[in-house]
Amino acid sequence: MRLVLRLAGAGLTAAMAAIHLSLWDDGYRDLDTIGPLFLLNGVVGILLALALLVTPVRLLGPVAAVTALFTAGTLGALFLSLTTGLFGFDESLDADLVRPTLYVETAGVLVLTILAVTAFSHRRRPRR
């Protein structure tokens, strides 16, 4: 089960990174503050996806937790940009990739949180 969660979490994190890099390449790079943040999100997302795949089981809990928090922060930033605006940028629900991003990031937060909880609970089990 943990392998499935690990692969799903890495895949969702990589998808989130790919979306941000694609949007950055499609013109978001020209936006003050938002542009560099999209690039940073894409690069960090790739690194976290790779970390989820190669991290030993004993360290998986912290890596999954950090990735879940990163994804939740990204999702929160999207909600802000859809409602009040973020750094002077207002996003529309009808804009390219907004809905897929909402789905990917929401699923990512759920999967990564479950992975972190199961990984931490596995670490705390007494050995027989």
Label each PLM-derived region with a short phrase.
Residues 1-128:
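Membrane-interface extramembranous regions
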